[in-house]
Amino acid sequence: MITSSQNAYQYMWSNDESTEIIWKVGMTISSYGGALGQIFFNYDFQSFKPDYVPATWVLNLYSEQDLRFAANFVTQPTGYPHGLQWPLVAKYFGNESFIAQNMLHICMPKVFRLSEQYLIRAEARANQKNYSGASKDLSDLRRARFQGGNGTISVSEQNWLEIIEEERVRELYMEGFRLQDLKRWHKGFERKPQEQSLTNGSSLKIEADDVRFVWPIPKHELESPGSQIQPNESNK
């Protein structure tokens, strides 16, 4: 059950239960899948050694009133020799029922959630120049995510894409949507050095519609006997 220390959004991620979930991959203690949150924590009951941490620009998208921040991130010292403290991706730390059995980072994938449908319709309405309808969808979603229901927002012809892009990051962070979003919007991205990051790997720029947005065809499929599959641009 939801406790005083958890809001409904946090409970959805810590217990895989919510009226907002349209379809999820069900799991039980005796029948479950992989550990979705492993790479974000690598917790060994002594320390956290994450493979990835969220970028500063993502953290800065959330306001103090946004209930999603506490559900999505938790600041912890890492177990690496440098001992740095950093916000970690918390939404996949694991289902509490599994954690009670010392089974970490196991969550039920939530393939369809109601909030995604609101975001899809908001974008569709904005593309149809129905900015009032798009604003209503975004505001309805945000009121469910902000303390006191204070999430009203308005979009226009000039700002709708920027606002919807930011809201999709806040709501769907690390759920597998970002690549397809950038492809759909014909946008590139740039990785910039972060606080305490290493120089190597801290800078990368991919332009819009770069061929690398499409994964290369696996080599074994190209070279298999009798294969008539042709390489795509990413193979070249």
Regions found by a protein language model. Give the residues of each.
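Acidic/polar-rich alpha-helix caps and helix-coil junctions
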Residues: 1-38, 49, 62-236
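Aromatic (Trp/Tyr/Phe) and Gly/Pro-enriched flexible surface segments
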Residues: 39-44
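Residue-level signal for threonine
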Residues: 54-55, 218
